[in-house]
Amino acid sequence: MKSVLAFLGSVALATVLVLAVWIGFLAAFPQIGPRIGQTPMDVWAYLVDGKPAQRAQLLDGLVITLRDAGIGFAVGMSAALGGAALALLSREFERSAVPVATLLRSIPLVTLAPILVATFGRGLTMVAITGALVVFFPAFVTIMSGLRGAPRETMDLVRAYGGSETTALRMVALPAALPSLFAALRISVPGALIGALIAEWLGTGEGLGSTMLKAIPRYDYPQLWASIAVVAAASIVAYTLVGAVERVVALRFAGPSVP
């Protein structure tokens, strides 16, 4: 029960903060005007009191965007975890991989998207690569830092008893890196959504990314702001879910003393 209340409290607090920033932004820039700058109440009215077709369009777009974000998240996190493990096992791999990852991170994804579309088409492969590029670098660095922080004495003890480097990684480094792993997961959740939106803006023409893009030339600002609000809500819920899973895992490893 406490975990459920903590989860709901985190969602409520994050929602209040987002609404405060939203209202504060509109108040700080009154030149935006009420036609363009939709308030939370305007978006609520659009979602609740609007036409069923409007809600259906947003729901369909959200399902596609969550699918795209999930694909990019899974590919990016898998690559980050595998790359960080290889970097721990092989200094040569780390010296080669880190500069390449840094180079890819320094290139704006918007400039890479047309190349990805031309190379891989507008399907899920392009979506997976786009999302993975956003997710990979921060997750890779965070997880690698956590693995490097594993107790050296315990790692040496495993080796002294005949354990391989892989055994030391599995038994010592990975459990020690769980806080860093969950930090990487929390960082990557909004990143995966951003990657999905970019892929939809510039590639697939589906999902909420496409809905936002099409709303601008139609001056359909209620739909634009509603799409942004739905994406923000999905990001808050996903971020908080990762935190809830982290707490469960922490209780599993550390016992009931975890706050």
PLM features per residue range, with description:
Residues A28-A74:
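Periplasmic/extracellular loop-to-transmembrane helix junction in inner-membrane transport proteins
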Residues T102-P138, S145-G146:
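Generic hydrophobic transmembrane alpha-helix motif, especially the helices
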Residues R91, R148, W225-P259:
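C-terminal transmembrane helix and the adjacent membrane-cytosol boundary/short C-terminal tail
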Residues I129-L133, E165-A199, W225-A226, A238:
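Transmembrane alpha-helices
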Residues T142-I187, L208, M212, L251:
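Short cytoplasmic-facing helical segments at TM-TM junctions of multi-pass membrane proteins
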Residues D68, S210-S235, Y239:
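Pore-lining and gate-forming transmembrane alpha-helices of multi-pass membrane transport proteins
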Residues M1-F25:
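N-terminal signal-anchor/first transmembrane alpha helix
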Residues I71-A101:
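Transmembrane-helix boundary motif in ABC transporter permease subunits
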